């Protein structure tokens, strides 16, 4: 009798241990511990999406040549609406030389946000002497006929909607961004800068324009408010307000110009960036980890990305690209693997 009781207790304990082990395994899997243990080292093993000379492949695409290596992403969508006239001049023939083009990532149903942006910071004639444009990047809602009809009417009225054939979901924001790059290259190639921004942001266009004059030294180079952004007018303001001041200070101290003073003078007079500059600016995450717990909105499986850290990146909510940087980003996207998409 006692022997049977001992055996029953042992069996009961074994069942309990099995349950505990099973629950522990499920929890470890759910919270990503198992995936964390299987990750590859970013510092030691990073190679993504493949080994190859991407720069030379991008140069081939820019030149219109057939690349030696097949792209891994073909931008396999088409544009329902292209806002193809958005960046043309008043004659509707040539592309206008724009200072900034805003590409606003917007959900299909966010017409109220788009209307606010059109009336405020996205208004294209906000500054009379600064040519700007604003377009809105949308996916589509195939199951909502009424909403699609509303977008159609909105596009006819404002002519600023760029809509792709992919479903408008959170995980397709990567495709939406790629669509913005493609649209800029095909339909707005003469803008000096491009700002990608979400539709729940407010952008101070004035501060942005000031920043783009001298990104490295902003805001220190601004001694006084600037009312106009016309290049010739700005140069005259700078000459009259700052150049004489620097010269007077030099005469008082009876010193000759040295490189530091000359550099300061150049910052005041030659203030604009070169046309071929590669500028990519925004809030930088230098080192962050992929989310491996399956409850996370940003969960990433090892098959999608196997490394323990992301490369340094600029957050997607708001960032600015110069024309050359945008061209590089667009053509490089052909050799960048797209992860989640729906």
Give, region by region, the residue ranges found by the protein language model.
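Secretory-pathway lumenal glyco-enzymes, predominantly type II signal-anchor Golgi glycosyltransferases
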Residues: 1-342
